[in-house]
């Protein structure tokens, strides 16, 4: 028996990383939001790795923060170790990563949601979305409550029809021992939404007291802690170490002898797994010549003995897992606290979405996170943020926020999912972007904070900080362009001491910094008028000066890219009547219905010749 339970502008289904960002974004823009979760104890749960950020993922967190999201602030408040990755490489791929205290991360995010003015957080299982005349009307819960909703954001994570697999044991269950959502998939299929089956997995959690760390390599955090959020001032905190060890031939032998019992290899798993996060049995099978694989031991929090064993994800039977783990140096006497498992779950085809993350077929229905076929907390949070913003824009009858590939990694992520689709859990990598040098984690605010402010999400405090930082960078660049370094004897002696050639004539400090062996910091002695600026400002000034030529080339590429992005394709085009298009192109274009020529050009199966046909068609049809 159903009953009327209330009215909301936005209902968010799921309170994981996507759901939390979606709810907070919509609420902060001014919408009345209901966020539903199967368990109030699983808000912003981290059911797999205990860290935020990493290669490309750190960029996503910075971009979420720049737009006004919460993830960066939350990890800055709850991390137990911080490291900057890829520092030996160029600035485009420098990526921040932090170990989280899982419980504190989850509890703080729950507290933020509970205290956000326009948010109501409830323990509710949503079993159906009510649609009327092709538009969202409301949602129905398992307990019979019906809520009117102007928009709905699906952020169901890995819960839809979730199934846990450990060797020959398989049962219906969500991540971390939680309940699965069993009824919503059927409703989505009845609404005409395509459903696929994906798979992911997680390693065991082991007892810290049973680990011999003396046989491992300690991995401490960085001395200089760099925050994720542009709102966070200097961070100082006592950090907790991680540890590195390796598998060996004994480990691999245990796995090889028991591959027939692995669900990955005996056909018990239907779902497609993540290419870039393989199980240990998959790694051993795929790389038979490799005699060892890295294993990182990572703390799950400050006040727990649970340790995450990164690199040993598995779905082998429990007793085989224990035997296999105990062959690893330092884990000879290890005791399991939680068993490793694989999890299968339902997700949708992201090619049925617009770039706003709204369904092409159901008005007012948005989705974000693993339901869209992605993997990872950061990818989920990024999509949730955009879905939440655009649900709010829909309610307020404003244009959606559409991020392009040149705006940020979030734009790349969404464009890849919606335009190219994915046949496996999608993971963000820096190599997926054509404009890596422009999309640095250090300039995320310069790229995106204005956009966040324009949609009403960025607070006045954040906006003021952004303006101050932007102007500091701009004025410092102008200043060093006007600082002339002469070819005096003491200057040349200083340059020679840095293995840099002598000056033959005066040069600006800005030009001098471009020398490969020099940078903004090394030439401080020559810069008499330098004032003490924040480290992040100095870093941005240094990068802008040193890589100016490369940055300008990428900006030229972006301008060419935008010419195609600005050629809009009407949504009502009948591609079957466009003379000259190949049959495959007609099918792909009709399914995906790209917004512009640029998006059309990135669809698999649409050739450059097809793009030429479309350009000619537009020119003649819409003169």
Curated annotation (Swiss-Prot):
Predominant location: cytoplasm
Binding sites annotated in the UniProt record for FAD: 14-19
Keywords per UniProt: Cytoplasm, FAD, Flavoprotein, NAD, tRNA processing
GO molecular function terms attached to this record: flavin adenine dinucleotide binding
Binding site residues for NAD(+): 273-287
Location relative to the cell: Cytoplasm
SUPFAM superfamilies from the UniProt entry: FAD/NAD(P)-binding domain
Family that this chain belongs to: Belongs to the MnmG family.
Entry-linked HAMAP family: MnmG_GidA
Assembly and binders: Homodimer. Heterotetramer of two MnmE and two MnmG subunits.
Name of the protein: tRNA uridine 5-carboxymethylaminomethyl modification enzyme MnmG
């Amino acid at each position: 028996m159903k009953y009327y339970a209330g009215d909301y502008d936005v209902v968010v289904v799921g309170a994981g990383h996507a759901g939390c960002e979606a709810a907070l974004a919509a609420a902060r823009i001014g919408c009345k939001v209901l966020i539903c979760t199967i368990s109030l104890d699983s808000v912003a749960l981290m059911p797999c790795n205990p860290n935020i950020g990493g290669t490309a993922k750190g960029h996503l967190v910075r971009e979420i923060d720049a737009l006004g999201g919460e993830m960066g602030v939350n990890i800055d408040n709850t991390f137990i170790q911080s490291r900057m990755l890829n520092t030996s490489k160029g600035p485009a791929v420098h990526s921040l990563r932090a170990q989280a205290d899982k419980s504190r991360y989850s509890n703080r995010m729950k507290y933020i949601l509970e205290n956000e003015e326009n948010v109501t957080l409830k323990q509710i299982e949503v079993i159906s979305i009510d649609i009327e005349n092709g538009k969202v009307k409301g949602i129905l819960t398992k307990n019979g409550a019906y809520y009117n909703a102007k928009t709905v954001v699906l952020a169901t994570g890995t819960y839809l029809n979730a199934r846990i697999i450990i060797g020959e044991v398989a049962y219906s269950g969500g991540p971390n021992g939680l309940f699965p959502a069993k009824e919503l998939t059927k409703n989505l299929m009845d609404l005409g939404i395509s459903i696929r089956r994906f798979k992911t997995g997680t390693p065991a959690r082991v007892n810290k007291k049973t680990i011999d760390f003396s046989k491992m390599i300690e991995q401490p955090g960085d001395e200089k802690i760099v925050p994720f959020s542009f709102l966070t001032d200097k961070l100082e905190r006592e950090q907790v170490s991680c540890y590195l060890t390796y598998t060996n031939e004994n480990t691999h032998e245990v796995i090889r002898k028991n591959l027939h019992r692995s669900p990955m290899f005996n056909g018990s798993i239907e779902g497609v797994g993540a290419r870039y996060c393989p199980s240990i049995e998959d790694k051993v099978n795929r790389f038979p010549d490799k005699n060892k694989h890295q294993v990182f031991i990572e703390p799950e929090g400050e006040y727990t003995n649970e340790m995450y064993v990164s690199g040993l994800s598995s779905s082998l039977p429990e007793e085989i897992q224990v035997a296999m783990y105990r062959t690893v140096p330092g884990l000879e006497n290890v005791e399991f606290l939680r068993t490793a498992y694989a999890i299968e779950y339902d997700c949708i085809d992201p090619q049925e979405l617009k770039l706003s993350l709204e369904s092409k077929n159901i008005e007012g229905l948005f989705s974000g996170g693993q339901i869209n076929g992605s993997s990872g907390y950061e990818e989920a949070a990024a999509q949730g943020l955009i879905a939440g913003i655009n649900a709010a824009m829909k309610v307020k009858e404003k244009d959606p926020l559409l991020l392009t590939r040149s705006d940020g990694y979030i734009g790349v992520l969404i464009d890849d999912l919606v335009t190219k689709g994915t046949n496996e859990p999608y993971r963000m990598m820096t190599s997926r972007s054509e404009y890596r040098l422009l999309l640095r984690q250090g300039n995320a605010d310069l790229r995106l904070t204005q956009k966040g402010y324009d949609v009403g999400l960025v607070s006045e405090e954040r906006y003021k900080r952004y303006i101050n930082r932007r102007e500091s960078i701009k004025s410092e660049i102008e200043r060093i362009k006007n600082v002339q370094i002469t070819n005096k004897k003491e200057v040349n002696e200083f340059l020679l001491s840095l293995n840099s050639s002598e000056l033959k004539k005066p040069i600006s400090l800005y030009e001098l910094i471009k020398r490969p062996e020099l940078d903004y910091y090394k030439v401080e002695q020559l810069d008499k008028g330098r004032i003490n600026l924040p480290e992040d400002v100095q870093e941005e000034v240094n990068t802008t000066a040193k890589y100016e030529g490369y940055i300008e080339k990428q900006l030229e590429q972006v301008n060419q890219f935008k010419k195609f992005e600005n050629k809009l394709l009407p949504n009502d085009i009948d591609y079957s009547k466009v003379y000259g298009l190949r049959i495959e192109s007609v099918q792909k274009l009709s399914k995906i219905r790209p917004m512009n020529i640029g998006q059309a050009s990135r669809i698999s199966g649409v050739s450059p010749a097809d793009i030429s046909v479309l350009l000619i068609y537009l020119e003649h049809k819409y003169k």
